[in-house]
Amino acid sequence: SSALEVSSFTIDTTAPTLSQETPVTTLTNDNTPNYTFSSDEAGTITYGGGCSSTDNTSVNGNNTITFNELADNTYSNCTITVTDNVSNPSSPLSVSSFRIDTTVPTLSVVTAVTTPTNETTPDYTFNSSEAGTNSYGGSCGSSSTSATSSGLDNVTIILTQPDNSTALSEAQYADCSITVTDPAGNPSTALSVNTFKVDTTAPTVSSTSPTDNESSVSVSENISVTFSESMGTASVTTNTSNTSCSGSLQLSSDSFSSCVQMASSPSSSDNLTFTVTSSPKMFYSTTYKIRVTTAAKDSAGNNIAQSTQTYGFKTSVTFPMTAGSAHSCYMLDNGSVKCWGSNTYGQLGLGNTTNQGVNSSEMGDNLDAVDLGSGIKATAIAAGGNHTCAILDN
């Protein structure tokens, strides 16, 4: 027969050759990441391990595929195989191990900024659930390192102005915040720094009571000092045990060679005005001065400059006790008068001639006060023989 010509055909037993071109970034917060590989043949793509994709055809050259959505995890078993048009499968191409992380760091405050504070570069401590890079918002920056080195650690930073170097000015700060971005690029929710006040101004003495150069002060008068701003209560102290000049609030009649002992520590209802009471009472007709030492500090920790009254104040020259030939009278701190002894001529001022104080039960609170009139007080008293006189405040 005539020769039959067989149609031309090609035998191909060569499998495609694959190589990795652009691996998946690791760490990444992209849970549908891209991956680029090259193939020397076109064909059909199949996937192995923990990865898959809807991209199932390849070309001769570079091929970029997008993996289907992946959960947060480390992927180290993903493979790609290309089968050419005559069913020759390539060797599986191992995708370089990568990690998906879409979890944002969680921040919490550990130690807030003290407020008020006289520290212009105050510390602030917070906790982060992950390591990462710090960034700052609002009116604050930080001169500290920008990295949180490891998760679950407490991180102490030094706050500055937003340029990350200049100390904070005297002001109130209510808008400062911290954000930590983890290595995968996930930013935390901004952590708001507590509102705090920077105060570097020293307090001053606004007023004293008794006032400087005041006279006729009662020997039982309370001693008060009012400051220009809220004070640290622990720093306003006085001497309650002896006559040494200790404590930051002092009272003296001898230019502070010694000081008056006080009945108790200074008291205050507003941290502005502090009051003490001498124990025993002050002496009559004596000049005293009030001094506040540098040990007193405002609530931010700023020490006051020492303040001493220039002239001081003078206590009353009137001695409150007087005596006649057979009776005695005493002017109490509240301006009332009590008398005891012989009352033959009514010299006790009680409107009768009955002797008083014969028995102990008639003394003290049981001893009647002289009726001076409603709301009227005595300012001085004197007695002699069988009479008593008083100067009244009306």
Specify the residue positions occupied by each region the protein language model found:
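Beta-sandwich strand segments
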Residues: S1-A3, S87-L93, A184-L191, T238, ...
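Flexible, low-complexity linkers/stalks enriched in Thr/Pro that connect modular domains
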Residues: L4-P16, S94-P105, S192-S206, Y311-V317
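Short, solvent-exposed loop/edge segments of extracellular or virion-exposed proteins
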Residues: L18-D30, S108-E119, G141-S142, T204-S216
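A short glycine/threonine-centered beta-strand motif
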Residues: F37-E41, F126-A131, V219-S235, L392
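Acidic, low-complexity Ser/Thr/Gly/Pro-rich repeat segments typical of extracellular/periplasmic
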Residues: G49-E69, G138-A167, A202-S316
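Conserved structural position at the C-terminal beta-strand
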Residues: V82-D84, V180-D182, V292
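Conserved core positions of repeat-based scaffolds
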Residues: H327-Y330, C339, H387-A390
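Short glycine/serine- and acidic-residue-enriched loop/turn motifs that recur at repeat junctions
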Residues: G341-M363, H387
